[in-house]
Swiss-Prot record:
Functional summary from the UniProt entry: Catalyzes the hydrolysis of the adenine ring of phosphoribosyl-AMP.
Reaction catalyzed: 1-(5-phospho-beta-D-ribosyl)-5'-AMP + H2O = 1-(5-phospho-beta-D-ribosyl)-5-[(5-phospho-beta-D-ribosylamino)methylideneamino]imidazole-4-carboxamide
Gene name, Swiss-Prot/TrEMBL: hisI
Residues engaged in binding Mg(2+): 87, 89, 91
Subunit structure: Homodimer.
Top-level taxon of the source organism: Bacteria
Protein name as annotated: Phosphoribosyl-AMP cyclohydrolase
Required co-factors: Mg(2+); Zn(2+)
Species this protein is from: Ruegeria sp. (strain TM1040) (Silicibacter sp.)
Length: 129
């Protein structure tokens, strides 16, 4: 039988309740809320999770720059947060977003543009012109 939730079942969310890796990061998958397409994966720390929830603009942690990365801040290809979901182990996030323009830095709609078929790589998506 399916459990029915009521207002008393709601729990206040805190980024500190997530399980971060040894670098203090958690993976976050971005998914287009309208098409269901998987757009990208990037990392978040507790502060970037909090910033994302506060601003509604998806904010990642750049491991290479060691700084916050507000998606689309320089390119204009923003990700507007619709809903943030936590997986069952609390060690991964799913950001349901409205994506403006391409999500990938290669100018493709998705970062997942290479398929492996019969042991060979196939480019299945071209850059947006």
């Amino acid at each position: 039988m399916q459990k029915v939730f009521n207002m008393h079942d709601l729990v206040k969310f805190s980024p500190e309740t997530l399980k971060y890796n040894e670098a203090g990061l958690v993976p976050c998958i971005a998914q287009d809320v309208e098409s269901g397409e998987i757009l990208m994966m990037a990392w978040m720390n507790a502060e970037s999770v909090a910033k994302t929830l506060e601003t509604g603009r998806v904010t990642y942690w750049s491991r290479s720059r060691q700084s916050f990365w507000i998606k689309g801040e320089s390119s204009g290809h923003v990700q507007e947060l619709v809903e943030l979901r936590v997986d069952c182990d609390r060690d991964a996030l799913l950001a349901m977003v409205r994506q403006t323009g391409p999500a990938c830095h290669t100018n493709r709609r998705s970062c997942f543009y290479t398929a492996i078929r019969d042991g060979e790589e196939h480019e299945i998506m071209t850059p947006i012109s």
